Amino acid sequence: MNSRTFDVVVIGGGAAGLMAAMRAGQRGRRVLLLDHAEKVGKKILISGGGRCNFTNTGAAPERFISANPHFCKSALARYTQHDFIALVDKHGIAWHEKTLGQLFCDGSARQIVAMELTMNS
């Protein structure tokens, strides 16, 4: 049996799990991503009618309800929707804005999943 060492194990290959794994990989961590589905990002592939509503330009801490209001402020300050848009642009993924700041891929949600998986390797 092969023995491999990982710095981070992420359980769940949905949007949040892929993002967590991607960010850890960007920071030089060796990441193992586990999911029960046969393919990670399966729900992302059907989101937004297959085009992935990948962020919203109107995301702001005051629009979230939380028992700890500082959590949203801190989380959104560390990685903003503009950071993700820049990443999408860097990977050459064309996108457009729909109603109320919703951003969608011009092509397929597969582009977002592929980008996140590439960032982990």
Model-derived segments and their meaning:
Residues T5-L33:
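N-terminal Rossmann-like FAD-binding beta1-loop-alpha1 element of flavoenzymes
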Residues R78-S121:
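Feature captures the FAD/FMN-dependent oxidoreductase FAD-binding
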